[in-house]
Amino acid sequence: SCERTIEIDLPAHEPKLTIDCHLMAGKVAEAKVSHSMHSMGNSNNFSALPDAEVVLFENNVSVDTLIYVDDNTEEWWDYEIGVFVGDYIVKSGKTYKVQVNQGNYETAYGETVCPGNSIEISEIDMSELLIDSFPDYWGEGNYQYYRKGKLKFKVSGPLDENLHYFLSITDQNEDAPMYMISNDPIIAGQEYNISDGGVYPSQKLYFSGSSFNLNTVLTIELNPESSWYGETDITDGLIIKLEVQNNDYFEFMSKLDDYDQAVYNPFAEMVFLPNNIEGGYGIVSARAEYEKTTD
C-alpha cells in the first residue's frame, strides 16, 4: 500500500437558499427552507431561516404565503429547521412555483406540475384470500393472524408517459403496507421491481406511464411468504392505493434511495441529487394518491 497527501484548492462557496418541497394533491403545501454550505464547512453553522418569505404560485398567480412552524419533533437530515406550512389546497393538473426570499441570499424558486390520476380500480375479487397465522412472540401460546393469497382487480384508463405509478395494499386499520408480488407483465417487466434477476415481494409495485390505455385484471399475491405484522381485524376492508408521482418526485426519491444505499459503502459512486431550483438548490416536486377500499 502507499500513502500520499493531495492538496486541493477548493473555491470559495457562495451560500444559496435550499428548498425541499414535495406537494401532494388535495393537501396544503409544506416546504423546508435553509441554506447551502461549503463541503468542508462546520455543520454547527447550519441554521433555520424562520424569517424567509415563502410564496406559492399556481399557474403564475400567487395563492398562498407559507408560515414558519418550529416543529422540533421532525428532523431534516438530522437538523431541526422547522417547516413552512400553507393553507391553500394543492390541485391536480396545475403548475406550481415555490419562491423563497430572504435578505441575505439570492431569491430562489422551483416549479413543478401536480399530477392527477386517470386510472380506475374496479371489479375487486377477494375470493382467493386465506387466513394464516404466526406465533405471537410477545405472548406465549398466542397467535397473530393475517390475510394471504390472490387478490384480483381491474385497472383501466389512460396512462401518462411522464408519470410513475406505485401500487400498495394495506389493511384499513394498519399503516404498514402488505408485502406482495405479481407476475403480470406490466409489473414483472419493470426493472424497478426486479432484484438479483427476479421479482421479489415488496410493499409497493411500480409501473410506468406510456401512451396507451390500460385495461387489464391484475393478480396480486399478498404476503406470499409470510407476514411481519398481524392484522387487528381480519374481517375489515383492504385499501388499494395508487400513488402517482411526477418525474421530479420520482427522480429525487430514486436518487435519495441510491444515496441511502451508498452512505456506508466506501466503494460506492458519488450520488448527485436532482436540483430544479433556480437561484439555489433543492427540489420542488408533486404527487397524487387514489384509494379504493374494499367492503
Role assignments for model-derived ranges:
Residues E3-D295:
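A sequence/structural signal for flexible, mid-protein segments enriched
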